Swiss-Prot record:
Protein name: Tryptophan synthase alpha chain
Subunit structure: Tetramer of two alpha and two beta chains.
Gene name tied to this protein: trpA
Keyword Cell membrane found: no
Keywords: Amino-acid biosynthesis, Aromatic amino acid biosynthesis, Lyase, Tryptophan biosynthesis
Family from the record: Belongs to the TrpA family.
């Protein structure tokens, strides 16, 4: 783990509550609004920020996040600007962990070594790259770890006992458990199944296990947070941004505040959840 990530999860464990991990697309609907949203997240209760890297072919994303990526790209967002977004955020917040989430193609085009150096300079703590399996660890995972950036893996309900050790081998920071198969924005999973999955994963790792896909309300966050070390919310935040926009897709007067209000409610859910020790 990076020091920021390690410190944050240790503090949350001491408090006895799960992390609220909030995702939004960098540059949606524009750079300045996106930075305003990012700055508002910690004050509203976000413990970790997942910053989406826009990509033209996001195969694992549902319609809401696909549209967010399209809005960001249309507004001129690039990977370089996404790193700058993190750097600008770091000018006023040196404590909140930032995880970049997206696909390998933009990183490959940028240049792996240059990307990692720029990510470190921007204050990035971790990466989630959804289309790089463990068999391709030499591409980005190993170089990232060597430079001190966490590489966070996704586990799913179909990740069986035989596959799980390979998935977890070079994972650091936390494990992201995708609580159901399919694309982002799916329905809420069965909390009892999530609890069993978290326990199963923890038999193989001491890393925190954060659960995402389908969490949209404070009650959802409370239910999932009862057994997970963290609750990941993405589509609900992206939808909140989308509904706040003007008819021509520009930021509304209340876009930042609308996101902050939603996150404040989600934080109430995670803060009322009681962590169950996964043994």
């Amino acid at each position: 783990m990076t020091a920021r990530m390690d410190k944050r999860f240790a503090a949350l464990k001491a408090e006895g509550r799960p992390a609220l991990v909030t995702y939004f697309m960098g540059g949606d609907p524009d750079y300045d609004t996106s930075l305003g949203i990012m700055k508002a997240l910690p004050e509203a209760g976000a413990d970790v920020i997942e910053l989406g890297m826009p990509f033209s072919d996001p195969m694992a994303d549902g319609p809401a996040i696909q549209l967010a990526g399209q809005r960001a790209l249309k507004a001129g967002q690039t990977l370089k600007k996404t790193l700058q977004l993190a750097a600008d955020f770091r000018k006023t917040d040196g404590d909140t962990p930032i995880v970049l989430m997206g696909y390998y193609n933009p990183i490959y085009i940028y240049g792996v070594e240059t990307f990692l150096d720029d990510a470190i300079a921007a204050g990035i703590d971790g990466l989630i790259v959804v289309d790089l399996p463990p068999e391709m660890d030499d591409e980005l995972c190993i170089p990232a770890i060597r430079k001190g950036i966490n590489f966070i893996r996704l586990a799913t309900p179909t990740t069986d006992e035989k596959r799980l050790p390979a998935v977890l081998k070079n994972t650091s920071g936390f494990v992201y458990y995708v609580s159901m198969n399919g694309i982002t924005g799916s329905a809420l999973p069965d909390p009892s199944l999530v609890s069993g999955a978290v326990k199963r994963i923890k038999q193989h790792t001491d890393l925190p296990v954060c659960v995402g896909f389908g969490v949209k309300t404070a009650e959802h966050a409370k239910l999932i947070g009862a057994s997970a070390d963290g609750v990941v919310v993405g589509t609900a935040i992206v939808n909140q941004i989308a509904t706040s926009l003007t008819k021509d897709g520009k930021a509304g007067a209340d876009t930042i505040q609308a996101v902050a209000t939603l996150v404040r409610g989600l934080s109430t859910g995670t803060r009322s959840a009681r962590l169950v020790a996964a043994e």
